Amino acid sequence: IMPSLVGSEMCIRDRDYICAGRIEQGTMPKDPVMCKSIVSTPLADKVAEHYGVECRNVLTGFKWIGDQIAKLEAAGQVDRFIFGFEESYGYLAGPYVRDKDAIIGSMLICEMAAYYRAKGSSIKEELERIYAEYGRYLNKVDSFEFPGLSGMDKMVGIMSGLRENPPKDFGGDAVVKLSLIHISEPTRLGMI
């Protein structure tokens, strides 16, 4: 029985499989682009770099990956997009869908499992090969819910506090880098 893999681990396998397969089949576009959410594993950046793929890190939510596809499309370069993912098991393996697509993700996992089985390997063994090549990354997901308007107020307070007093350590580990991400896109909250 194979232990379950978290979303980032599965996406890393898919990313490596797609890149290696496109190179093997001669279908890798010039200057290929992959996108991932900022909460997804940084191991994806290393895999992308290995294959000469630009890795764009976007905010959480598939609309941001879709936005990158739209930008490529507007520039007449949509064929450069080869893969997008979030750690929540969401995949895009081409520019034809602009939102999380479980169907293509399921198909990719099945295809990948069959491919590696035919080679005498497995998804887990291939993930271990990737870790041996690039280093092992810890992937852990914590989720917090803040329902309703009071929840929104609480989130705003937490974020303000983090901006005004950035943490020196987090979970017992020293903070070595802090990135403040701010978007100026208006939200629909003012419409409520």
Report residues per predicted region.
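Generic secondary-structure boundary/loop-capping signal
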Residues: M2, F62, S88-Y89, G94, ...
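Phosphate-binding chemistry for phosphorylated carbohydrates and sugar-nucleotides
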Residues: S8-E9, R13-E133
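Single conserved hydrophobic/aromatic residue that forms the stacking wall/gate
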Residues: I1-G7, I12, I181-I192
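A ubiquitous, low-specificity "background" feature that marks scattered single residues
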Residues: L92, M107, L138-V141, M191
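Catalytic-core signal marking the mid-to-C-terminal active-site face
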Residues: K119-S184, R188
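Intrinsic-disorder/low-complexity coil detector
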Residues: M2, M28-D31, N165-P166, E185
